[in-house]
């Protein structure tokens, strides 16, 4: 069992280094290279890489801006508990960009999950979305938060 854990750690370290290298490329404006570096990790389900691919599609960094693809990449990462991606999904639901219409109930849910996960900006977004909601919508959102929180953050 220890050997398996050790092997996993050895495999995870290079992946983390690749993602950090891709972040550096993004900061340097080398977006196409960053996309190529992130793509394998994102395709294999790494939440950090998925979130960064979402950012790239949302902002048109190295790829054509595509709100639907951005939302899908954010959602993949968010479902794995990535707080930044959860805020991204919340924002898309709040404004409705790339979606049929805004959905404040789901925006509230995702911002709340993001805040639970540790995103410091999520609380600010949550305050803003609450101003647009009815009491009934907030009640519905609380139900969704409880449903998702149980399996996404079982120890919080």
What are these regions (language model features)?
Residues 12-14:
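N-terminal signal peptide c-region/cleavage motif recognized by signal peptidases
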Residues 121-156:
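Terminal, low-structured helical/coil segments at or just beyond the last alpha-helical repeat
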Residues 19-25, 37, 41, 52-59, ...:
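Hydrophobic face of amphipathic alpha-helices that form TPR/SEL1-like repeat modules
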């Amino acid at each position: 069992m220890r050997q398996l854990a050790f092997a996993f750690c050895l495999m995870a370290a290079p992946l983390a280094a690749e993602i950090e290298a891709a972040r550096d490329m993004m900061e340097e404006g080398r977006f196409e290279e960053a996309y190529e570096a992130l793509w394998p990790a994102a395709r294999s389900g790494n939440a950090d890489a998925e979130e960064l691919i979402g950012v790239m599609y949302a902002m048109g960094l190295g790829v054509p801006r595509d709100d639907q693809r951005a939302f899908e990449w954010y959602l993949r990462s968010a479902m794995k508990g990535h707080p930044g991606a959860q805020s991204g999904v919340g924002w898309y639901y709040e404004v409705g960009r790339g979606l049929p219409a805004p959905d404040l109930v789901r925006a509230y849910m995702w911002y709340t999950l993001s805040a639970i996960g540790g995103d410091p900006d999520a609380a600010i977004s949550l305050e803003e979305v609450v101003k647009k909601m009815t009491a009934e919508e907030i009640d519905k959102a609380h139900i969704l938060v409880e449903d998702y929180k149980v399996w996404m953050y079982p120890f919080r």
